[in-house]
Amino acid sequence: MLDIKWIREHPEKLDEALAKRGIEPQAERLIKLDLERRSHVAKVQSAQERRNTASKKIGQALAVCDQKMAERFRAEVEEIKVFLSSATAEEKRLTESLENALSALPNIPLDDVPEGKDESDNVVLRHFSVPTTFDFTPKEHFDLGQNLKQMDFERASRLSGTRFTVLSGALARLERALGQFMLDVHVYEHGYTEVSVPLLVRDESVYGAAQLPKFADDLFRTTDGRWLISTAEVPLTNLVNNEILEISDLPLRFSSLTPCFRSEAGSAGRDTRGMLRQHQFWKVEMVSITTAEQSLIELERMTECAEDVLKRLDLPFRTMVLSTGDMGFAARKTYDIEVWLPGQGCYREISSCSVCGDFQGRRMNARYRKEGEKTLHFVHSLNGSGTAVGRCLIAVLENYQQADGSIIIPDVLQPYMRGMRCITA
């Protein structure tokens, strides 16, 4: 959530930033809502002061046995109470109106984020390795998996409908191996703390991560009102919800391997074959909670951690800086890592690392105290995929395929596969 005080002081900057995201000016409307709320709050506070004064005068009147004066002040107190009863409800309405308006606005892009309408305006930052080449026509992952008889979309459809996959045998073990390998790298070598989190969360947690109210249609909700997580970012970030941290505790770095659940409401007709875009998939997530001064340094570090996973798997990839038109709602700057898929003949996103500034910290009321200071500051948060396990499985299948349809297992995964070196039918 954006800071209304900052908006009051910098209305032009807000509208300029929103224009980069293709959003109409909002500063005038927000300032008007805030002025109305603050004006009403001032009236409420004035009434409360008058009530307190009148209450004291009741006691003073009774002390000198002036019943008539005491009754007059009692009547004044009752009149003020009636006003406050409705005024408090109106204050709540005005506050909610302002908060709803602020909650609907995305974060402000950093100055060095490239301006653009969509993904076509993203900028390539760097490449790792060159696209894998073959002396045969490479197959896509779904053909490879089905030919191995270890990837079953028909049975998955009977079980759950479209956009689900059943893996079996060595492919199921390979998926598990990838997740364990990624988590081990982040925990034992990159300094993240492993966390096992709930897969069901409350409204407040989804709101704190800035997925509500805007993205409700992209999520699955249970009959009791809880939400299935679309990413472990939601519970990991909310570990500091409503907490006050000491600066000496920061940065906090969390990592988790979880299933993720997405409705893919806006993806009709896209990636309908295979397991590239699923309702349920595994992902390793990284989350950092830090200070304003360290957040951009942490973004570079987090991105390098995600890249390191792909380098160890020897998978060709490129890192992109997302344009203002393609960046996520809560992000101030985002790096996307795209892995090469020979079967498709293109790069596809496998990780996204974002710095959110205090956007989520403000929603969560998560703050920290600098040494020797009484003033509290909202934490800065970052999140990144480290990486999407299913998409990494796709990348391994397509980049390590052989002419006979078998799959060579990357060296770093073989210990997780009990020494298996090749997957065959």
From Swiss-Prot:
SUPFAM superfamilies hit by this protein: Class II aaRS and biotin synthetases (SSF55681), tRNA-binding arm (SSF46589)
Record flagged with keyword Mitochondrion: no
Keyword list, A-Z: Aminoacyl-tRNA synthetase, ATP-binding, Cytoplasm, Ligase, Nucleotide-binding, Protein biosynthesis
Xref: InterPro entries: aa-tRNA-synt_IIb, aa-tRNA-synth_II, aa-tRNA-synth_II/BPL/LPL, Ser-tRNA-ligase_type_1, Ser-tRNA-synth_1_N, SerRS_1_N_sf, SerRS_core, tRNA-bd_arm
Keyword Nucleotide-binding in annotation: yes
Cellular localization per UniProt: Cytoplasm
Residues that span the membrane, as ranges: none
Amino-acid positions noted as binding ATP in the UniProt annotation, renumbered to this chain: R262, S263, E264, E349, I350, S351, S352
Function summary: Catalyzes the attachment of serine to tRNA(Ser). Is also able to aminoacylate tRNA(Sec) with serine, to form the misacylated tRNA L-seryl-tRNA(Sec), which will be further converted into selenocysteinyl-tRNA(Sec).
Domain notes: Consists of two distinct domains, a catalytic core and a N-terminal extension that is involved in tRNA binding.
Subunit structure comment from the entry: Homodimer. The tRNA molecule binds across the dimer.
Protein known as: Serine--tRNA ligase
Natural source organism: Bartonella henselae (strain ATCC 49882 / DSM 28221 / CCUG 30454 / Houston 1)
Gene: serS
